Design a protein with these regions (language model features):
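A beta-strand edge to alpha-helix "cap/lid" segment located at domain peripheries
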Residues: 2-33, 38-119
Length: 119
């Protein structure tokens, strides 16, 4: 039986958007702490990233933080949460889904997918 945990959308929105901040994206240590060792991302470009590749890509990202819309969360298990939202910069938008997993008391991003979306 899965024990239900209280879901705090504001907490998960902060976790997710923390990675959108340039200072965080450009910090190898902060990103490494937030991403699980088995992290995988399917980017809107069609590329697949593991943890090391994602850290390298984020470390050189100089873009502004995207606007976030339609944010939602759903518990998948007692220590696993699905986050979904739409984000965009300029005229480029994507639907995003992330899976956050609590390991040793810390929430870490284990999966992320971005799918190009119409504005």
């Amino acid at each position: 039986m899965i024990r239900r945990m209280p879901l705090d959308a504001a907490f998960f929105r902060e976790l997710e958007t923390h990675l959108h901040r340039r200072a965080v994206r450009n910090s190898l240590e902060e990103v490494a702490e937030l991403l699980a060792d088995d992290f995988v991302e399917f980017g809107s470009s069609g590329r697949v990233y593991d943890k090391a590749q994602a850290i390298a890509a984020l470390s050189t990202d100089e873009g502004e933080a995207p606007k976030v819309h339609d944010f939602a969360i759903k518990a998948l298990a007692s220590a696993v949460v699905l986050v979904t939202y739409r984000s965009g910069r300029g005229d480029q938008f994507a639907w995003r889904s992330s899976i956050w997993r609590r390991d040793d008391g810390k929430w870490r991003l284990t999966f992320h997918q971005a799918t190009a979306a119409a504005r």
